[in-house]
Design a protein with these regions (language model features):
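Short glycine/proline- and aromatic-enriched beta-strand/turn motifs that initiate or cap beta-hairpins
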Residues: 21-69, 101, 107-111, 289-295, ...
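Short loop/turn motifs that connect adjacent beta-strands in outer-membrane beta-barrel proteins
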Residues: 21-27, 65-95, 142-151, 207-225, ...
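Transmembrane beta-barrel strands of outer-membrane/channel proteins
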Residues: 28-36, 97-105, 154-160, 203, ...
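Outer membrane beta-barrel transmembrane domains
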Residues: 29, 109-117, 244, 249-368
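Extracellular loop and loop/strand-boundary signature of outer-membrane beta-barrel proteins
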Residues: 44-45, 119-125, 182-189, 228, ...
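Residues that define the transmembrane beta-barrel architecture of outer-membrane proteins
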Residues: 51-57, 129-133, 150, 193-199, ...
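Residues on the lipid-exposed face of transmembrane beta-strands in outer-membrane beta-barrel proteins
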Residues: 57-63, 101, 135-141, 156, ...
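Long, hydrophobic/aromatic-enriched structural stretches that serve as scaffold segments
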Residues: 78-167
Length: 368
């Protein structure tokens, strides 16, 4: 962990020294994203159950729109954006290019106590252990008006590595943060144990409904409402539609929001001339599902998986939190947000294993 932090800080200072005098559109953003149900114990102790979506982290997240202009990394993103927009692509301009290294972890309530006489019953009817490690890239273009945004994401990684197993076992065994949870012994039965390549391609379209910039140059506002729709193909086959809102001291150009687990919450890399912001934010999203590899397995046989019949074909998600941007010096700022996120049951087996679950989303960025 110390090595990762040192590398992150070194990258920040190196890029800062070489690019701090960029143009208005060359803003950089580097930061971290942490998803953890542990932090909800301070709201209500019962919400921290190490269950379902247990934890996730992206370290670092780096955003710089000009990365997407050329090169092979974002060539698929540019191709997909042009294919979707067709001739209207000339009315759009680059708004974001993001790269991150990330992990997500999923566990059942039952952590593998082999002395439990109901062990097999619990393993078969709860969700399986699952983990995903990936390099995520995203590319966004917004309409010239600034009120519509198309985002293309591609995640390349592996399901079934031992990163989550090692971290969770260490935390529970050594009682980090005062945890008294059981040591997990079920990771040997995780989805695709030993590792298996995986891929996800996503396309998301956001449009601003209320709080649009009027083009006068006055971008201050107090309320914004946007809608979005998304399609995901790969280790997830699903679609979604939702709404997001921001209320407070706003720069209306910064309306783009992303509430997916382990993603930059800010899908527009705006200009360096942003004012102070402080706002409440919230959203509601409905998801339709045909496939979830982290529940149903992928190509490799896994001892515990859920069937298509057991997969809930419709789920709901909500989010509520607070965000801020604090500018300092001439072109620099700190951006931070804290958000609670909830999700309805993802599968149907027996009632004791079906539940809404929630987690905290923490994001911190340095901009220059």
């Amino acid at each position: 962990m110390k090595t990762i932090i040192v590398a992150l800080l070194s990258m920040v200072f190196f890029v800062n020294n070489t690019n701090a005098q960029g143009t208005e559109e060359s803003i950089h953003r580097v930061g971290v994203v942490i998803n953890q149900d542990y932090f909800l114990k301070f709201v209500k102790p019962g919400l921290n159950q190490d269950r379902n979506y247990t934890m996730g982290a992206a370290l670092p997240v780096f955003q710089y729109a000009k990365m997407g202009e050329k090169g092979w990394v974002y060539a698929p993103h540019r191709f997909l954006a042009k294919s979707i927009l067709g001739k209207s692509v000339t009315n759009y301009r680059l708004a974001d290019a993001t790269v991150m290294l990330a992990n997500t972890t999923f566990t059942p309530l039952y952590l593998g106590n082999l002395h439990d006489p109901e062990s097999e019953y619990k393993r078969k009817n709860d969700r399986p252990f699952a983990s995903l490690n990936f390099i995520g890239t995203s590319f966004g273009v917004k309409q010239d008006s600034g009120n519509e945004l198309l985002s293309i994401g591609i995640n390349v990684g592996a399901i079934g590595l031992d990163v989550s197993k090692a971290f969770q076992t260490t935390v529970h065994r050594d009682h980090w943060f005062g945890t008294v949870a059981d040591i997990p012994y079920g990771w040997e039965d995780q989805i695709s144990d030993g590792g298996e390549p995986t891929l996800l391609v996503s396309g998301k379209y956001d449009w601003l409904i209320v709080g649009k910039s009027d083009g006068s140059g006055n971008n201050k506002g107090n309320f914004q409402l946007s809608a979005n729709t998304e399609l995901r193909l790969g280790y997830y086959v699903s679609g979604s539609a939702g709404i997001n809102t921001r209320v407070g001291l706003l720069d209306k150009r910064n309306w783009g929001m992303n509430t997916l687990p382990i993603s930059s919450g800010y899908s527009i890399v705006s200009s360096q001339k942003n004012p102070f912001e402080l706002f409440l934010m919230g959203g509601l999203k409905g998801n339709s599902w045909l496939y979830n590899a982290l529940l149903m397995g992928q190509f490799r046989n896994s001892p515990y998986t859920l069937s298509f019949k057991q997969l809930n074909k419709f789920t709901m998600e909500w989010n509520l939190g607070v965000g801020t941007k604090i500018p300092f010096c001439k072109n620099r700022a700190i951006r931070a947000s804290v958000m609670a996120v909830g999700r309805s049951p993802e599968f149907s087996t027996v009632k004791e294993f079906e539940r809404w679950h929630s987690w905290a989303d923490l994001q911190l960025y340095y901009e220059w």
